[in-house]
């Protein structure tokens, strides 16, 4: 009878009948409940509700469900939600998130109904993943309807509930790399929330004690367990990392540890995650860049790397110029790890020029990472390529001799001396570089750091020999020998230094570079 009646209903009228049927399920009458359940079943199966109608339906079910007692009616509503999730996953998921940002017990019941069969589970998980990944760059708004950042906060709660279901494991495993990254990014996002956004999230839900970042961490743990990584969850717990992820000050360290534990994943999964990270880092700038690079650098510590390394190296070339605070140092540390392994070191050589170019603008910490790496890279080169690279690097290094960091001063002076022996041909250019290094080196002959002072004297001697400058070489040897004997000098090192200007014509030698050549 109802099927005949339904043929004459307009699409807009069908929505009204559906809503009335849902509301009538609250009545205790078995007859009315049975009829209402039949109407809901038929309308859900035969009608393609548009997005605005889906929102009304989901709200109606959410409001009515606590008052529905009949098993027949509850089963009918479950089937309706399953059909809506299958036909209109985007609208259904968004509507239920609007109904309950903090995923109340009623919402949990509805989410479970929506993922009760694998095809719908896959669609719902993909939609939640899309929402998690769409939060970056959205402006703050007090409207949850159009605010993707707020929806992203809400998405972690139902995701946690869904991942606890045994029936979701197959679908979760299929998109594990994407879900894993989305949740780690969400951890970073939730530790940087604006006060207004937190207030919007908690409006009318202040009794719920599970904060947004805790929801995300719970979902991440559930995801790892659902794909058989329970031992990794325990290992992370033992290091106090789950707690660290909750804090803005320590969450990046927590991300590092979680990523490091993922090195035990099968190679196919690791490769997929690396490719996913590279793709994300190639897109427009986002708040995820630092977190993504932290994860990538840890995964690159794996002993087995294939074609994905070429993609990563090309990505590093652009990120060495990133203005993002700390990004240069992060990239350089990842490259340094690759240069220290014979299987991957040579693939990093294409970055040598880019690293050299960044030395001048880099901070001391970044330089301290870059200089040992450049030394390693030079030793992997041969012939003319080595000579040209060494000459270019030698021209940049004297500017680093005066760095505030004694480590950088020491590394740059030692590396400069090494480059003199790597250059073949181009003697005129190298001589110009060597002459320009004399004054910066002389400033550090008595550096407050004894290691730097000793390196400066060795470098000065090396430059003098390279230039075949006899008087300067003699002076450098005297300085080196005198320093070694300073402990035995009457009156100590200070007394010894006070005699050098009268014994050694340093200034005259430096002012007359053409005299006394070997």
Model-found features: residue ranges?
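Hydrophobic residues within the alpha-helices of tandem HEAT/HEAT-like
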Residues: 2-6, 21, 25, 36-47, ...
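HEAT/HEAT-like alpha-solenoid repeats
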Residues: 9-25, 49-65, 87-106, 128-137, ...
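Extended HEAT/HEAT-like alpha-solenoid repeat tracts in very large eukaryotic scaffold/adaptor proteins
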Residues: 1, 5, 32-39, 77, ...
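Short amphipathic alpha-helical segments embedded in low-complexity Lys/Glu-rich regions
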Residues: 98, 112, 148, 172-180, ...
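Alpha-helical repeat/alpha-solenoid scaffolds of the HEAT/ARM/MIF4G superfamily
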Residues: 161-259, 269, 274, 469-474
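Long internal repeat-built scaffold domains in very large eukaryotic proteins
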Residues: 226, 463-469, 485, 492-518
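Short coil/turn segments at helix-helix junctions and helix-capping linkers
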Residues: 8-9, 23-34, 45-49, 60-72, ...
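Intrinsically disordered, low-complexity regions enriched in proline, serine, glycine
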Residues: 52, 93, 122-124, 140-141, ...
């Amino acid at each position: 009878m109802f099927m005949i009646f339904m043929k004459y209903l307009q699409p807009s009228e069908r929505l009204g009948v559906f809503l009335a049927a849902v509301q009538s399920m609250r009545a205790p009458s078995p007859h009315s409940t049975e009829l209402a359940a039949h109407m809901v079943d038929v309308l859900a199966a035969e009608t393609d509700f548009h997005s605005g109608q889906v929102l009304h339906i989901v709200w109606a079910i959410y409001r009515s469900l606590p008052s529905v007692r009949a098993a027949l009616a509850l089963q009918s509503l479950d089937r309706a939600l399953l059909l809506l999730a299958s036909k209109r996953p985007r609208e259904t998921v968004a509507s239920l998130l609007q109904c309950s940002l903090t995923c109340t017990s009623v919402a949990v019941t509805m989410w479970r109904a929506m993922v009760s069969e694998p095809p719908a589970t896959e669609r719902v998980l993909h939609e939640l993943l899309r929402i998690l990944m769409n939060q970056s760059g959205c402006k703050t708004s007090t409207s949850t309807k159009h605010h993707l950042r707020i929806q992203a906060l809400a998405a972690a709660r139902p995701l946690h509930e869904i991942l606890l279901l045994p029936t979701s494991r197959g679908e979760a495993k299929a998109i594990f790399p994407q879900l894993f990254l989305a949740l780690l990014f969400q951890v970073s996002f939730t530790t940087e929330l604006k006060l207004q956004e937190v207030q919007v999230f908690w409006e009318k839900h202040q009794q719920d004690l599970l904060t947004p970042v805790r929801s995300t961490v719970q979902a991440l743990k559930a995801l790892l367990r659902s794909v058989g990584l329970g031992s990794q969850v325990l290992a992370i717990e033992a290091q106090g990392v789950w707690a660290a992820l909750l804090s803005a000050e320590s969450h990046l360290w927590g991300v590092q540890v979680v990523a490091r534990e993922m090195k035990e994943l099968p190679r196919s999964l690791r490769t997929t995650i690396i490719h996913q990270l590279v793709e994300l880092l190639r897109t427009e700038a986002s708040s995820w860049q630092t977190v993504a690079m932290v994860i990538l650098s840890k995964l690159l510590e794996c002993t087995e790397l294939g074609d994905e390394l070429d993609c990563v190296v090309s990505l590093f070339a652009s990120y060495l110029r990133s203005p993002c605070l700390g990004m240069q140092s992060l990239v350089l540390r990842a490259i340094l790890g690759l240069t220290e392994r014979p299987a991957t070191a040579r693939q990093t050589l294409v970055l040598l020029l880019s690293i050299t170019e960044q030395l001048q603008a880099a901070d001391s910490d970044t330089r301290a990472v870059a200089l040992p790496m450049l030394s390693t890279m030079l030793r992997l080169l041969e012939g003319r390529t080595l000579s040209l690279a060494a000459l270019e690097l030698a021209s940049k290094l004297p500017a680093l001799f005066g760095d505030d960091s004694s480590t950088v001063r020491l590394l740059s002076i030692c590396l400069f001396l090494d480059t003199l022996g790597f250059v073949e041909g181009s003697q005129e250019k190298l001589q110009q570089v060597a002459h320009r290094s004399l004054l910066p080196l002389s400033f550090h002959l008595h550096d407050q750091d004894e290691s730097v002072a000793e390196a400066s004297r060795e470098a000065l001697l090396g430059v003098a020999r390279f230039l075949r400058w006899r008087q300067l070489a003699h002076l450098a040897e005297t300085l080196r020998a005198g320093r070694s004997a300073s402990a035995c000098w009457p009156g100590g090192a200070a007394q010894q230094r006070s005699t050098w200007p009268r014994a050694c014509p340093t200034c005259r030698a430096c002012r007359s570079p053409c005299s006394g050549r070997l």
